[in-house]
């Protein structure tokens, strides 16, 4: 039970009849925590292959935005009736509508997202393995993790790391919490600290958002982004009308839309010296009162789609399209294709032209659009 509570701490917030059978779920649905053997190396044979479009004029630069608690159903890019993505709608992005998460909590999803194993095998593993970021570094890329959340859950243990709460920038931070835009305020300075010889080959930056972390949704957005009012301003969601909870949550999506547009804007400024691209995907979703459920953390087998279906957005600069020969038009034509976090490891390696025996082309969702 203690293991359950560590992995599903969000459950204590649930306003949900399922709480009464919570102990039963512990016995019947959730596997016991498995013993982990020693760390296993992965992708030691990784190297940079020639990109499909040839030798790059400028090194590739990928920003991987790791979203927090964003659900696909609340993105207007995916058909939500409220305009929560006004800025991304103006960019040449692809928003994938049918993406399944590895889990229903950050602790469960995040390590799985960076693993080569996929959700089913990750849950069964008997050893820990190096991850996507290790393989990228084995190939020679510079890698940076910028964290505006509760840490990287061990995924950046061997990667240069910046915790934004340590930056003490008052224009972005109050106490230990900062707006996600603080990462853009510091990214240039932090990139300059990475080894120059690696940056000359290419760079991958992970930006881990505060995003839509609840239940205090109202704390995630500045006043100018409170588009939907009145919003719930209580961390006990039962004290608010459901409409107020939804307003507060939707405002966090509006701010994420702004942040992602700012990331794209920053990447465009790098085109003189880099070949930029962005990949955004959330770790898990969120319940907002559907069937009287709130927040997240239900065991996967009984979790509703609001907790398991997450937004994923890609942006490729014209230079990156030419380099990778991956067409945004083709990606947009496949936006409703069922995908999952299982695709991330292989898709990022494929996009960055990493050749390794652990890469599986059939799991690379970019591969289907190469040369099309």
Model regions: which residues?
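Catalytic domains that recognize anionic headgroups
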Residues: 1-372
